[in-house]
């Protein structure tokens, strides 16, 4: 996201992975149908990236990422921004993450070297393939 912003693309990062420190609950309430879209507040980082984050506590255990509301929201944001980047939850622990991947034009899988096995990668690749998600790359990071 920062690279796109430095290239002067209007960039939005939608962080669905977890609660961000101080995340506003407006986005989660909107996804749950308890608030209108104007309740969604983006924070702007010093590098110019706009960020919208989930507030998981506000979701009361509901799986909201596979919703039509999120799909519509992302489509609207694609019209407003040059680049919309979605940080999805861990594919190993959240079935909704696969639904989010289906909404994206491109998918890059990131995994920590010490927490992933070849079997995990095979299962993730197979599930993404079965869901017609094109994987553009895999980034393995960490010690």
Model-derived regions: residue spans:
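P-loop/Walker-type NTP enzyme "switch/lid" segment
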Residues: 2, 6-83, 90-102
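Conserved beta-strand/loop subsegment of P-loop NTPase cores
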Residues: 12, 52, 104-143
């Amino acid at each position: 996201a920062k690279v796109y912003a430095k290239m002067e693309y209007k960039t939005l990062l939608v962080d669905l992975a977890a609660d961000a420190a101080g995340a506003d609950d407006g986005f989660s309430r909107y996804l749950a149908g308890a608030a209108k879209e104007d309740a969604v507040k983006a924070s702007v980082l010093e590098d110019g990236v706009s960020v919208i984050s989930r507030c998981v506590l506000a979701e009361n255990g509901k799986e909201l990422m596979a919703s039509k509301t999120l799909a519509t929201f992302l489509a609207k944001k694609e019209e407003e921004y040059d680049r919309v980047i979605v940080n999805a939850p861990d594919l190993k622990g959240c079935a909704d993450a696969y639904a989010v991947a289906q909404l994206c034009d491109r998918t890059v899988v990131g995994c920590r070297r010490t927490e992933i096995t070849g079997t995990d990668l095979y299962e993730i690749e197979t599930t993404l393939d079965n869901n017609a998600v094109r994987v553009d790359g895999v980034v393995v990071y960490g010690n």
